[in-house]
Amino acid sequence: MKVLLKNGTVINVFTGEKEKTNVLIEDEIIIGVGDYDDSDADKIEDAEGKYICPGLIDGHMHIESTMLTPAELAKVSLLCGTTSIVADPHEIANVCGISGIRYMLRASKHIPLNVYVMLPSCVPATRFDEAGARLSAEDLKM
């Protein structure tokens, strides 16, 4: 399905420029910015007075530090324009081990936020710390 966002202000995140224009989206992917008319789309959305920019990516975060489940984090992140996150689960891995990482993977699977889970590099955290779990390279083979 093609959706036309009409008369929105597109923000160029590289230059900071703003341009009032139209955006054509097909199956949730931006396929064009510029002059389009109503016949180009199946659905028309009036974006007058609204800003349009690409989805933002949080390149490093710890979901468990937010005290939210991945689904609840998705709700607040999407409201602020963040559509993707790269999650480092080292905190839950330090406490729960591989089962904590598996929980994060399962809980992030069917939510509207793109969650990319990296392998934690420090479980246990340091040689002076003991939080209850240990991971080896063998544990992380999935």
Regions found by a protein language model. Name each.
Residues E19, P70-A74, G100:
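Hydrophobic alpha-helical membrane context
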Residues M1-L4, V10-P54:
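Histidine-rich, glycine-flanked metal-binding segment
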Residues E28, G55-E64, H90-N94, L119-C122:
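Short N-terminal helix-initiation segments at or just after the protein's N-terminus
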Residues K75-M142:
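Divalent-metal coordination cores built from histidine and acidic residues
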Residues N12-G16, T66, A131-L135:
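Short loop/turn motifs at secondary-structure junctions and domain boundaries
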Residues I25-D27, G32-G34, D46-A47, M67, ...:
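Short, surface-exposed linear patches
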